[in-house]
Amino acid sequence: MGNRAFIYPAKGNTKKKLGVYLHWNGGPDSVIPLIKYCKIRGFRPFSDGYGVARLATVMGNFFGGTLCIGIEYASPDGVDSDHTPYAITDDWEIENIEEYRLHDSDYPTDKQVLEMLQEINNAQPEKDRVPLEFLKSTKRPNLKSVKVGQTVVYLDPVYEVYKTATVAAIDPDGVPRLKIYDSPFCPWKENHNNRLDGYQFRIVK
């Protein structure tokens, strides 16, 4: 398969797909962490032009240079035979991942993925970097596992920055509540925006 790759949306006709071309570093050891990083960041689907742009941005920040990355359509006959194909689902998973897991010696271990995630993260602008807790897991913890007094790091969807807060209470329906919005007009116990189910978060301690 070589070390070139074409990363394209799993949806639709392969012959008409806009995707990202990698001239080097196209093996699973590079591509898997890059795709996982985009999932962690919560980017729009890869089938959306915005998703393609975000992946290219992350790659450009990480690899640098001027010649290794391109945005292009698949050739009329589909993905070129000398390019490793990666079909990306709308939730940022590699649809044909089992092929590489079984047959590619470059398939990375969990430790290697985490190490590269940290390298990718450090290469991004400081304001865009994510906390280590998010790099360690792409899944939000079960709300029922969160306890009063625990510290969580969460993504503020308005300002798109990561913040920390302490769980202040558990609502009657079992949803943890923070105390980040509080005013005489709308006390924190009544403000729906304090409910943790509305955020992407990880438990710090």
Predicted regions and their residues:
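Short, solvent-exposed aromatic-acidic interface loops
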Residues: 18-29, 182-184
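Short aromatic-glycine-enriched beta-strand elements
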Residues: 175-179
